[in-house]
C-alpha cells in the first residue's frame, strides 16, 4: 500500500491536484482512498460531485460509539473512496483536531483492513504545520510528502515551513519528501523559481500543472478533469504526475532554507514581476 500526503498553502490547488491524481490512479486500476484534512472539507467534492458529511459532523451528531464506516466513507469517480475530516465551528476549537479525530475513527472502524486500498492520499492544509496538521508526519501515517506550490513568495515560504516539519519528524521514522508539484496558476508563471527552490532543499519537481481553463470548467460541474475532459492535454498532465508519484523512489530529508535564502528567492520573484509589468 502506497501512502502519501499532499501539503501546501491554502488555496494553492492541493484539492484540485489530489482529486485529479486520485482519479488518474483509479482509472489505472488502483483502489484509492482520499482523506481530506482541510477544514473547508472540499477535497473530495469533484470526485463525489458534492460535499460529503465530515467525520467531525457525524461524530458530533452520532457520537463515536454509533458511527459506522458507511457514515464517513463515500464512493466517488472511478470507485475512489472519499473521507473528509472536517473542522470545528468557526471560532471554536482547533482545526487540526479534525485530522486526529478522522484518522482515529478510520482506524477504529477498520477502514484500511476493510477497504484494502492500494493508495492512500492525505490532503492537508500547510499554512501552519501545527500539531493536528502535522499528525500524518508525527504518526508516520504516510511514507512520502509532496508539496504543491506556485512561485508566489508566501507559497514558497509555506513550502519551506512544511520542509522544516518533515525534517523534524523524518528522524523519528520513515517519512520523507518525495518532491514538489509546481502549479502555474499565479501572477507570473516562473517554473525556474520553484525548480531552484527544489534544488536548494535537495528534492525534485515531480510535476508541473499549467494554467488551464478546463480545470475551472470541470470544477464548475463538480468534476475532476479526468472525468470532465479525459482526452485533454491537462488530463494527461495529471496522469503523468500520478504515475510519477506512484513510481517515485527519490525520497529525501529536505534541507529547509534560511530566511536569507528565502529573501534571495523573493528578490528574484520581484525582478520577474517588474519585468512582466514592463512587458
Swiss-Prot record:
Q: How is it modified after translation?
A: The reversible ADP-ribosylation of Arg-97 inactivates the nitrogenase reductase and regulates nitrogenase activity.
Q: Which gene encodes it?
A: nifH
Q: What is the lineage of its organism?
A: Archaea, Methanobacteriati, Methanobacteriota, Methanomada group, Methanococci
Give the originating organism: Methanocaldococcus jannaschii (strain ATCC 43067 / DSM 2661 / JAL-1 / JCM 10045 / NBRC 100440) (Methanococcus jannaschii)
Q: What class of enzyme is it?
A: oxidoreductase
Q: Which cofactor does it need?
A: [4Fe-4S] cluster
- The EC code for this enzyme is 1.18.6.1
Q: Give the protein name, as stated in the record.
A: Nitrogenase iron protein
Q: How many and how are cofactors bound here?
A: Binds 1 [4Fe-4S] cluster per dimer.
Positions that bind [4Fe-4S] cluster? 94, 130
Which Pfam family, an example, fits this chain? Answer: Fer4_NifH
Record field: catalytic activity: N2 + 8 reduced [2Fe-2S]-[ferredoxin] + 16 ATP + 16 H2O = H2 + 8 oxidized [2Fe-2S]-[ferredoxin] + 2 NH4(+) + 16 ADP + 16 phosphate + 6 H(+)
Domain of life (superkingdom): Archaea
> How far does the signal peptide extend, from start to end residue?
none
TM regions (residue ranges)? none
User: What are the entry keywords?
Assistant: 4Fe-4S, ADP-ribosylation, ATP-binding, Iron, Iron-sulfur, Metal-binding, Nitrogen fixation, Nucleotide-binding, Oxidoreductase
Its BP terms in the Gene Ontology are:
nitrogen fixation
Xref: InterPro entries = NifH/chlL_CS, NifH/frxC, Nitrogenase_Fe_NifH, P-loop_NTPase
Positions binding ATP in this chain are: 8-15
Amino acid at each position: 500500500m502506497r501512502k502519501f500526503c499532499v501539503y501546501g498553502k491554502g488555496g494553492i490547488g492541493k484539492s484540485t491536484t489530489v482529486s485529479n491524481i486520485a482519479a488518474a490512479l483509479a482509472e489505472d486500476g488502483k483502489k484509492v482512498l482520499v482523506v481530506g484534512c482541510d477544514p473547508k472539507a472540499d477535497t473530495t467534492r469533484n470526485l463525489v460531485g458534492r460535499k460529503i458529511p465530515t467525520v467531525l459532523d457525524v461524530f458530533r451528531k452520532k457520537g463515536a460509539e454509533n458511527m459506522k464506516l458507511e457514515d464517513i466513507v463515500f464512493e466517488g469517480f472511478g470507485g475512489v473512496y472519499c473521507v473528509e475530516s472536517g473542522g470545528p465551528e468557526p471560532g471554536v476549537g482547533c482545526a487540526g483536531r479534525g485530522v486526529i479525530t478522522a484518522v482515529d475513527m478510520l482506524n477504529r472502524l477498520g477502514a484500511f483492513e476493510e477497504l484494502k486500498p492500494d493508495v492512500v492520499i492525505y490532503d492537508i492544509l500547510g499554512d501552519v504545520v501545527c500539531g493536528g496538521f502535522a499528525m500524518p508526519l508525527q504518526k508516520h501515517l504516510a511514507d512520502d510528502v509532496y508539496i504543491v506550490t506556485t512561485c508566489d513568495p508566501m507559497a514558497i515560504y509555506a513550502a519551506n515551513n512544511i520542509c522544516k516539519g518533515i525534517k523534524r519528524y523524518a528522524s523519528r521514522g520513515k517519512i520523507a519528501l518525495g518532491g514538489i508539484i509546481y502549479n502555474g496558476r499565479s501572477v507570473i508563471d516562473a517554473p525556474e523559481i520553484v525548480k531552484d527552490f527544489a534544488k536548494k532543499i535537495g528534492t525534485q519537481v515531480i510535476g508541473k500543472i499549467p494554467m488551464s481553463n478546463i480545470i475551472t470548467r470541470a470544477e464548475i460541474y463538480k468534476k475532476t478533469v479526468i472525468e470532465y475532459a479525459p482526452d485533454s492535454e491537462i488530463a494527461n498532465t495529471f496522469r503523468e504526475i500520478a504515475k510519477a508519484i506512484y513510481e517515485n523512489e527519490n525520497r529525501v530529508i529536505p534541507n529547509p532554507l534560511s530566511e536569507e535564502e528565502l529573501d534571495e528567492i523573493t528578490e528574484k520573484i520581484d525582478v520577474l514581476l517588474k519585468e512582466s509589468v514592463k512587458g
